[in-house]
Amino acid sequence: MLHYLCFKNPNKDVSWLTFIHGAGGNSSIWSQQIRFFKQFYHLLLIDLRGHGKSISHEFDEVYTFENVTEDIIQVLDKEVIKKSHFVGISLGSILIRKIAD
């Protein structure tokens, strides 16, 4: 399972906003955005496999867009996030597009 952080807004009715970083980055790149968006959304920040606190050797599969996309979906399912807005940069935006497909 990927490492991730959740910041839940006190208002349970607000939407989720999920942040996906690019290759070579990790969830800490979003620190400035967290300050603003946590006022209006529940936030989910994910470290992709092999990045940040998500250790790559914990995953048996080859690193493909499909496998990494499935990693993200597993986190969404674990947190019971049925709908989310997404913010991504570089590789993160490619993965978001794969999720949308």
What are these regions (language model features)?
Residues 1-18, 39-41, 77, 81-82:
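Alpha/beta-hydrolase fold catalytic core
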Residues 19-23, 87:
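Short hydrophobic segments within beta-strands
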Residues 22-32, 43:
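Serine-hydrolase catalytic-loop signature spanning alpha/beta hydrolases and amidase-signature enzymes
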Residues 37, 99-100:
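Aromatic pocket-lining residues of Rossmann-like dinucleotide-binding sites
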